[in-house]
Swiss-Prot record:
InterPro entries in the record: Rossmann-like_a/b/a_fold, TilS/TtcA_N, tRNA_Cyd_32_2_STrfase, tRNA_thiolation_TtcA_Ctu1
Annotated compartments: Cytoplasm
GO biological process, one term: tRNA thio-modification
Function in brief: Catalyzes the ATP-dependent 2-thiolation of cytidine in position 32 of tRNA, to form 2-thiocytidine (s(2)C32). The sulfur atoms are provided by the cysteine/cysteine desulfurase (IscS) system.
Sequence similarity: Belongs to the TtcA family.
Keyword entries, A-Z: 4Fe-4S, ATP-binding, Cytoplasm, Iron, Iron-sulfur, Magnesium, Metal-binding, Nucleotide-binding, RNA-binding, Transferase, tRNA processing, tRNA-binding
The encoding gene: ttcA
Pfam families per the UniProt record, alphabetical: ATP_bind_3 (PF01171)
Protein name in the entry: tRNA-cytidine(32) 2-sulfurtransferase
Motif (PP-loop motif): 35-40
Organism: Coxiella burnetii (strain RSA 493 / Nine Mile phase I)
Length: 256
């Protein structure tokens, strides 16, 4: 697939997600969380292209959190943002030391790291008056999270395309919700984004997500529709076919 075709495909699915879930309204100030990885770069690049087209009237801003990880170098990232004329701020907060101190060797860092990062993001968005917080999770993240929740937490849940935060102060959006990771990888390579590796995540390759990712990949080899069917299942819930008493009144279920 050519560079333009990949970009066109991704933009199509981003616009579909924006419209399906009314993610961005006219006049919104959208804060895109840029981690330095392929997903967040792709999200920012595509949203910026859509903004430039002019059919969606919103402002865009890149928020970068420097978590004081060893080897962090954002000079190329700054250059890329300057070249694209995207306003941004790089905020330094040493969450790396906290995570390394609190989490025993061999355990997963992601949960604590995410909580610390989320708190900083929420505070910054509120202080600066942003109406939407855009995250770079894609289709594969959504379906992997579904299985991880079932297998390891005993819950049927995932990452919704649009979410009101627990404190009711922030609206989070995931415009890449319909986009496949393989297309994002291709697009990121073509765009030659100056990626910044995560020394925490990249040092833990044998995590639950990697195992679930392999499982879905293996199933997709037998049936290519497995990933798309899983995504479709997230919007095709049948409460009466499950066991949640809060969703369905089983105790009072009788023949009239």
């Amino acid at each position: 697939m050519s560079e333009k075709r990949v970009e066109k495909k991704l933009i199509h699915y981003v616009k579909k997600a924006l419209n399906d879930y009314r993610m961005i309204n006219t006049g919104d100030r959208v804060m895109v969380c840029l981690s330095g990885g392929k997903d967040s770069y792709t999200l920012l690049s595509l949203l910026n292209s859509i903004r430039i087209e002019g059919n969606y009237k919103f402002d865009i801003f890149a928020f970068v959190l420097d978590q004081s990880q060893p080897g962090w170098d954002d000079s190329a990232l700054r250059g890329w943002l300057d070249d694209k004329k995207i306003p941004y701020e790089i905020l330094t907060r040493d969450t790396y030391s906290i995570v390394k101190e609190k989490i025993p060797a061999g355990k997963t860092y992601c949960s604590l790291c995410s909580r610390l990062r989320r708190g900083i993001i929420y505070r910054y968005a509120e202080e600066q008056g942003f109406s939407k917080i855009a995250l770079g999770h894609h289709r594969d993240d959504l379906i992997q999270t579904l299985l991880m929740s079932v297998f390891y937490n005993g819950q049927i849940r995932s990452m919704p395309p649009k979410l009101l935060s627990d404190n009711k102060r922030h609206v989070l959006i995931r415009p890449l919700a319909y986009c496949q990771e393989r297309d994002i990888i291709k697009y990121a390579m073509e765009q030659q984004f100056p990626l910044i590796p995560c020394n925490l995540c990249d040092s833990q390759k044998n995590l639950m997500r990697q195992r679930v990712k392999r499982l879905i990949s293996d199933l997709a080899k037998e049936n290519p529709k497995v990933p798309s069917n899983m995504l479709r299942a997230l919007s095709n819930i049948k409460p009466s076919q499950l066991m949640d008493h809060e969703l369905w009144n089983f105790r009072e279920l009788n023949v009239d």
